[in-house]
């Protein structure tokens, strides 16, 4: 796994000089760029680890879901590297793709019957991918976010960030990350949250989530299923309900009803803040950043 990481890690930590100038702020703004690998996102950090252990276990292949396609792309790459089959359930294209919800699974047919014309959700796709995995010999289901092992794989993001900042004597005041299922924000804040839990330092950590799927800001902290079909084990998290179908938006990877147990616990303890943002606001900010 570490040998594979060497192909694209460490990922660059970049200072946003032009953004600072545009905003007219005295603050120094840095961003961790995880798009420097072939898959284009941080998802490869966990995909390669899970594919490695799947191959070591002697499996034929894996099934999964993906929202925007980042996880599906990353897992497809990792499976190709280890010569594993990869079956992805999503709303658009990827490895071997099955539009979700689909007519190929019991869960998919049930959802389509109850909600004709639905745009689906990550929860729906998870249920379908799990159903195929448990009914196909030599296959297992793997998840690209939410679960604790995925966040542990993603801690490489935060560890690299802290090493780089420490090297130049920089202590961040505010740490911000987008939050869908929790792998991105969880990986980024891991070493900083650890310092806070040990009482060593204090940071302002902000998780930013979509207003159309605001699990932290409008959800309840309870045990809930990780999927719509109620096949997966219960997990304690901030959730909008496993049957919640979010409205369609342009951030497919953020259309998930719940939040990682680790991130949820940190939020419940008051160590991190959460804010929900409309996608139109995000587009405007992205345009400013790009310019």
Predicted features, each with a name:
Residues 110-149, 157, 169, 194-200, ...:
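Active-site/ligand-binding loops adjacent to catalytic centers
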Residues 33-46, 62-72, 147, 176-181, ...:
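Active-site nucleophile and cofactor-binding loops and adjacent substrate-binding regions
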Residues 63, 71-119, 216-225:
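Active-site-proximal loop->helix
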Residues 49-53, 78-89, 190-201, 223-228:
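A glycine- and small-aliphatic-rich helix-loop capping segment at beta-alpha/alpha-beta transitions
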Residues 46, 57-88, 171-185, 205:
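A short, small-residue-rich loop immediately preceding and capping a beta-strand
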Residues 163-170:
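Phosphate/pyrophosphate-binding loops at sites that engage ATP/ADP/AMP, CoA/4′-phosphopantetheine
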Residues 1-59:
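Positively charged, low-complexity intrinsically disordered leader regions
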Residues 38-39, 70-73, 105-107, 149-152, ...:
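Flexible loop/turn segments at secondary-structure boundaries
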